[in-house]
Every structure is written in C-alpha cells, then in structure tokens.
Amino acid sequence: MRILVSGGGTGGHIYPALALIREIKKLHPEARFLYIGTENGLESTIVPKAGIPFQSIVISGFKRKISFDNVKTVMRFVKGVQDSKRYIRRFNPDVVIGTGGYVCGPVVYAAAKLGIPTIVHEQNSVPGVTNKFLSRYVDKVAVCFEAAAEHFPQSKVVMTGNPRASEVMNQNGMKGKRSVGLSLSKKSVLIFGGSRGARPINDAFVEAIEQFGNKNYEVLYITGEVHYDKVMEIVREKGNPDNVMIKPFIHNMPEVLTGVDLVVSRAGATTLAELTALGKPSILIPSPYVTNNHQEKNAKSIVDKGAAKMLLEKDLTAETLLHNIDEILLNTQTLQNMKLAAKQLGIPDAANKLFEVMKQLMKK
C-alpha cells in the first residue's frame, strides 16, 4: 500500500495528515508514504521529524486582489503540477490525499489528471480556496462539519470528522490533572488561546484573576510561551490564588483535556474535533483574524447543537469570561447537557473512517 499525502502551511492542515498516517501505520505497518509540501511551510520541519519521507515543490497562494503576484502564482502552479507528476510517477501511489493549504493544489490536481484515486479532507466549516478548486477533480471530499458539505458536489461528500480526534481518546485524565497541579476532587476549567496564546484572552484572564480566587473550582491557564513572562509579571503584582495554575505550555494536552470539566479556547477545527470526541463542554472565543471568519462559523456549528457557548472577542472582558464559566461550571445540569451534546457531535474514530473511504477508492 502506497499513499501520497499533501497539505501544509499551518498546523491545522498538517496534524490531521500525520494523525491519519499514524492510524494507517498501526493497521498496516508495511504501508509506504510520501508527503509533498513546501520548503517554507511548517510541514518541512514537522513531517521529516515524524520520520515520513518528504519532497517539496515551489508554490504560493493567490492574492485576493488582482496583482502581478497572481501571474507568478499561475506559473508556479503549472511548474508545481509538472514537478508533482514527476514525484507521483516515481512513487506510484495507490491513492493521493490532500489535507488543505495551497501546496496540495498542484499535487492533487496532477494525481487526478494521471487517473490516480484522489480525496481531499476539509477541516473547517468554510472550505479553503484550494479544496473548493480541487473538489471538481477529486473522487471524494471528506468533511468535518455539516456546514462544509454545501460548498462541494453532493455526490462526492463524505462525513469523516478530523483524524486528530482519534489521538485524544483513551487518555488518563486523572494523570493529566495531577501533572499540572489540579485537584482530583474539584471541578476545573482549562483556558488557552492556541499554541502561541492570544493576547485578548490573556488580558481578560489577568483582569479576572482575583475573582477566580473566590471560586470553588480550579483554573488552569495556558498563556502561550510568548506571553508567559508578561502575564506572570502582572500576576505577581495582583497575587496568584491557590486555585489558579498558570503554565506557558503543556506537552500532554490530550491527557489534560480528558481530565478537565470545561474548556475555554479559540475555535480552530482541530480543537473542536478533540473537544467533541471527548464530550467536553466549551466556551469558544473565535479568532477574528482568520480567513473567511471560519472560526466563528466552526463555533456556530457546535453552539447550535448545545455543545458550546460562543463569546466573541469584541465582547470579551473579565466579567463576560467569569459569567460564562460560572453559568456552566456552577450548574450541574447545564454541564451535563453540554457534555452529552458534545459527545453526540464527536467522531472519535475519524482517522479510521477517513482511511475506510481511501480503501474504497483504492479498490476501484
């Protein structure tokens, strides 16, 4: 079994691909992989580090305004297709999957034109430009949100969920809580703003820290390494309550997510896949700085089902943060209802579901 994977630029496109590869390796240790990305994307360091053969092509995304850069992009696309065809013929894959980001455009397009089974995986509720373009040529389009399906040819759409969801399952939540200093007997909320943190969330948290000290639940706050020193400087002045733990970063996020009762976070596709797979209630603060405002639309998909509350960044203050947390953590019935709603949305076997679709394509 030979599988070619392409996707990159951001972690949101790369980590689902790696989760899928790990799942396939568990089931088929003999499977061979080739990953095609760009040299300037995150994938050029993450993928080789994971022990997966990596090749690069030169490609860039379209600018939304008419510009000379777009002419160069078209030329790079044509060259990218030629280079991709060369790699594809050499590797001879049974199936090709693109997980988003402009790099997978020429790769998946080239594979489709060579008659190789192809599939794209769309993580967000609003598809990216590349996946919308590729949906005309591929055999299948795998989605994680029902809202994404309407943007693609219906005959090609399959709901698989995000392979990252599979990687947070079967973790030891008690071990996770202990590792960060949380009590096993108290309710707890985890607050974080993504891998690099988020200043508006930091500001609201710092403003609320004294009031958190009066609560009968515990708070674990992940600042992001960039913001840690600044946050701690303010916290030292205000005082750090015993029930509030502050960390720059944690390496065992799946364990900690499993252990806590409530999560406050951005609304990236990977985060939502993990939260729903675990049945975790959440307060989502979508980043307003992303393409097509897709985080707000991601959040709406699970807020509408009762699994989360949404707090827009423009409305985020110490008061609104505290109010939303109290409303869920201090009401056992609300907490329970949201847990059930999240669990019903989760697709914990997403990696296997996606692989099943790929296997069907290989048989054709």
UniProtKB/Swiss-Prot annotation:
Keywords: Cell cycle, Cell division, Cell membrane, Cell shape, Cell wall biogenesis/degradation, Glycosyltransferase, Membrane, Peptidoglycan synthesis, Transferase
Record-level Gene Ontology MF annotations: UDP-N-acetyl-D-glucosamine:N-acetylmuramoyl-L-alanyl-D-glutamyl-meso-2,6-diaminopimelyl-D-alanyl-D-alanine-diphosphoundecaprenol 4-beta-N-acetylglucosaminlytransferase activity; undecaprenyldiphospho-muramoylpentapeptide beta-N-acetylglucosaminyltransferase activity
E.C. code: 2.4.1.227
InterPro entries: GlcNAc_MurG, Glyco_trans_28_C, GlycoTrans_28_N
GO-annotated biological processes: carbohydrate metabolic process; cell division; cell wall organization; lipid glycosylation; peptidoglycan biosynthetic process; regulation of cell shape
Topology class, membrane: Peripheral membrane protein
Main location per the UniProt record: membrane
Binding site for UDP-N-acetyl-alpha-D-glucosamine: 10-12, 124, 195, 250, 295
Gene Ontology CC entries for this record: plasma membrane
One Pfam family per UniProt: Glyco_transf_28
Catalyzed chemical reaction(s): di-trans,octa-cis-undecaprenyl diphospho-N-acetyl-alpha-D-muramoyl-L-alanyl-D-glutamyl-meso-2,6-diaminopimeloyl-D-alanyl-D-alanine + UDP-N-acetyl-alpha-D-glucosamine = di-trans,octa-cis-undecaprenyl diphospho-[N-acetyl-alpha-D-glucosaminyl-(1->4)]-N-acetyl-alpha-D-muramoyl-L-alanyl-D-glutamyl-meso-2,6-diaminopimeloyl-D-alanyl-D-alanine + UDP + H(+)
Pathway noted in the entry: Cell wall biogenesis; peptidoglycan biosynthesis
Subcellular compartments: Cell membrane
PANTHER family for the chain: GLYCOSYLTRANSFERASE, UDP-N-ACETYLGLUCOSAMINE--N-ACETYLMURAMYL-(PENTAPEPTIDE) PYROPHOSPHORYL-UNDECAPRENOL N-ACETYLGLUCOSAMINE TRANSFERASE 1
Function (record text): Cell wall formation. Catalyzes the transfer of a GlcNAc subunit on undecaprenyl-pyrophosphoryl-MurNAc-pentapeptide (lipid intermediate I) to form undecaprenyl-pyrophosphoryl-MurNAc-(pentapeptide)GlcNAc (lipid intermediate II).
UniProt family annotation: Belongs to the glycosyltransferase 28 family. MurG subfamily.
Name of protein: UDP-N-acetylglucosamine--N-acetylmuramyl-(pentapeptide) pyrophosphoryl-undecaprenol N-acetylglucosamine transferase
Source organism phylogeny: Bacteria, Bacillati, Bacillota, Bacilli, Bacillales
